[in-house]
Amino acid sequence: MIYNFGAGPSVLPKEVLKKVQEELLDFEKSGMSVMEISHRSKSFQEVIDEAQSNLRDLMSIPQNYKILFLQGGASTQFSMIPMNLALGKKAYYAISGAFGKKAYDEAVKLSQTLDFEAISLGSTQSEHYNHLLKIDKSKVDEKMAAYLHITTNNTIEGTTIFPENLPEVNSVPLIADMSSNILAVDYDVSKFGLIYAGAQKNLGIAGLTIVIIREDLLNQKESLSSMMDYRILAQNGSMYNTPPTFAIYLAGLVFKWVKEQGGVKKLEAINRQKARMLYDLIDQSDFYQSPVLNEAERSICNVVFTSPSKELDALFVQKAEEKGFKSIKGHRSVGGMRASIYNAFPIEGVLELVKFMKEFEEENK
């Protein structure tokens, strides 16, 4: 049996893959693959409308928010967000992981040519991002603030800002990169001005990025590039140009699957159960360590851990691969191991990994 612990692209629900296989050559008796039908066709309009409706239901997205299906990966949002929201203002960033730093660095680069200021509220980089940044609200100029940017789940480092720990910044829009825990943890969308997520972790396949934006934040000026303008993209129903049709279709199937599993709250409970099995073993062991400083900040999507040495880490990864545990090697910047156990990852795979970890410890301690 193969278990895919990849951080993204990652495991997809078997039911979704079977549905794709079933419809691949003939979508809804059209005689064409969904990859072949026009994005302007009635058939595809129904696909994108249903996907949008199901996502709105799953996340309880208020009606004053637009849902956009975009290209370019979540990293493109590092540029689009300040371009659309920050002109003439101050853009604040809380940096608790590598992707948060990338978002900030991109804003700094843009601020050299565009009229806004990119401001870091601090970083935990010097501690290897082993904990989340404590945000000092007094450093935020509310009158001039365009937004505060956070990353809800740090895929590489294995930390999460859970809903109860979201920063409260009054009227300042909260912007969140939710790429690795959207639909895996239940957040109140109304607390955010904008949410974005690459699809290849919990939503589907690479090539699609979801943006959920409050309508009052849509850019009112026409000076931006049309392809980078949320307002134009929203006005055109995510089809200003040809969208990633197959990725949208597949995400729509994932949304249906999430509903069939009982919704986000139900999956979050299952994800917590899966993560707890691994963290319990790590905490009870003198062999394995979690690099995350605070237990309350541990991710339930990306469980990061190490053994007593880099040599044992390498041996663990080798033996794990031989056992069918794929892509469990930690990110190159961190090392160790990382078990990404997103929504579609089966609980049986976690049980098998726990068994393997115990055996490996006995053989190598």
Swiss-Prot record:
The entry's keywords: Amino-acid biosynthesis, Aminotransferase, Cytoplasm, Pyridoxal phosphate, Serine biosynthesis, Transferase
Pathway(s) where this gene product acts: Amino-acid biosynthesis; L-serine biosynthesis; L-serine from 3-phospho-D-glycerate: step 2/3
PTM annotation (N6-(pyridoxal phosphate)lysine): residues: 201
Enzyme nomenclature, EC number: 2.6.1.52
Sites where the protein binds L-glutamate: 40
Record's protein name: Phosphoserine aminotransferase
Cofactor: pyridoxal 5'-phosphate
SUPFAM superfamilies linked: PLP-dependent transferases
Sequence similarity: Belongs to the class-V pyridoxal-phosphate-dependent aminotransferase family. SerC subfamily.
GO biological process per UniProt: L-serine biosynthetic process
Compartment list: Cytoplasm
Gene3D superfamilies, sorted: Aspartate Aminotransferase, domain 1 (3.90.1150.10), Type I PLP-dependent aspartate aminotransferase-like (Major domain) (3.40.640.10)
Function: Catalyzes the reversible conversion of 3-phosphohydroxypyruvate to phosphoserine and of 3-hydroxy-2-oxo-4-phosphonooxybutanoate to phosphohydroxythreonine.
Example of a GO cellular component annotation carried by this entry: cytoplasm
Catalytic activity line of the entry: O-phospho-L-serine + 2-oxoglutarate = 3-phosphooxypyruvate + L-glutamate; 4-(phosphooxy)-L-threonine + 2-oxoglutarate = (R)-3-hydroxy-2-oxo-4-phosphooxybutanoate + L-glutamate
Cofactor binding annotation: Binds 1 pyridoxal phosphate per subunit.
InterPro entries: Aminotrans_V_dom, Aminotrans_V_PyrdxlP_BS, Pser_aminoTfrase, PyrdxlP-dep_Trfase, PyrdxlP-dep_Trfase_major, PyrdxlP-dep_Trfase_small
Any one Gene Ontology molecular-function term assigned to this protein's record: pyridoxal phosphate binding
Quaternary organization: Homodimer.
Source species of the chain: Lactococcus lactis subsp. cremoris (strain SK11)
Predominant localisation class: cytoplasm
